[in-house]
Amino acid sequence: MNQHTLLPKKTERLQYFGSVSPIKGEKPVEKEKMKDLQNIRKDYFFDIQHVGVANVSHPVTITSAMMPAEQTTAANFTMTCNLPRNQKGINMSRLTELLQVYHQNGWILSFSSLQQFTKELAENMDTSSATVEVRFPWFFERKSPKLEKAGLMHADIFMSVTYRKDQPFKQRAGISAKVTTLCPCSKEISEYSAHNQRGTVSIWADIHPAASLPSDVKADLLHAAESNASARLHPVLKRPDEKAVTETAYENPRFVEDLARLIAADLFELEWVSAFEIECRNEESIHLHDAYAKLCFSKEVDKI
């Protein structure tokens, strides 16, 4: 028969492993009596443009032009404000406090509601500017091309709003989506077949201050990325579907340079986009390296 040692009580175990009783200190425990270092005013030599909290995980509700029309996803927030040189620090707890208030009030994340949130953030912090950046996975239903077998895909979305007192909001939208690319050179020189691979398209689009946004910015950016690739990805494919996807890719060969330029053309035609950056990266199936292209364009500065 096994012999069992009788364990000491929980408090005794904790003390056994090093826990000690709290000491009675001399510093105040009431908030009103505590020294507030952040509010000490004097010259600290430099203004700070962005100070706040980053990597804040929080659930958000979003809407989508593609099914599911409404979904809750896990977002990552960066919330910052400016700090003049005569202030030592900010009250950072107010940033996450406001996020919790919006969450409790059933916040649906959109550029309109993010504008309101960012402006209120600046007012709560008593500063002249604030920036909120949000990243989250967006899920959408996709059917296979022939048998229409449905499954969920996702792309990573980026939203950013900057508020400056007495100035228009500065807004930016972004997406990182996966696509299929088939090599034109491989197709041209080979007797049969061509190497293809999965690629990543990342887009960042500056939103024109006077533009009316579409019903779903996410869908516009996804279309720009996928419709210019060799083929789209699918969560579920049966043999007839796989044949269709493979042949579609063969009919639409794309260098990484081609993909960047074609996406740029689509973004150029979107009235709500004032400037954009595009990154295309192919995980080459016949190389150990990636093929890479980056394209930047501003409608106000650059010419075609």
UniProtKB/Swiss-Prot annotation:
> Quick check: keyword Hydrolase in the entry?
yes
The catalytic activity of this protein is classed by the Enzyme Commission as 3.5.4.16
Q: Which GO terms describe its molecular function?
A: GTP cyclohydrolase activity; GTP cyclohydrolase I activity
Q: Which residues form a coiled coil?
A: none
Q: In which pathway does it act?
A: Cofactor biosynthesis; 7,8-dihydroneopterin triphosphate biosynthesis; 7,8-dihydroneopterin triphosphate from GTP: step 1/1
Keywords attached to this Swiss-Prot or TrEMBL record, sorted alphabetically, are: Hydrolase
What drives induction of this protein's expression? Answer: Repressed by zinc, via zur.
Pfam hit, one = GCHY-1
Kindly state a single biological-process term from the GO annotations of this entry. tetrahydrofolate biosynthetic process
The UniProt site entry described as May be catalytically important is assigned to: 183
Q: Does the keyword Hydrolase apply?
A: yes
Family designation? Belongs to the GTP cyclohydrolase IV family.
Recorded hits in PANTHER family, A to Z, give: GTP CYCLOHYDROLASE MPTA
Q: Which NCBIfam families match?
A: PRK13674.1-1
Q: What is this protein called?
A: GTP cyclohydrolase FolE2
Q: Which gene encodes it?
A: folE2
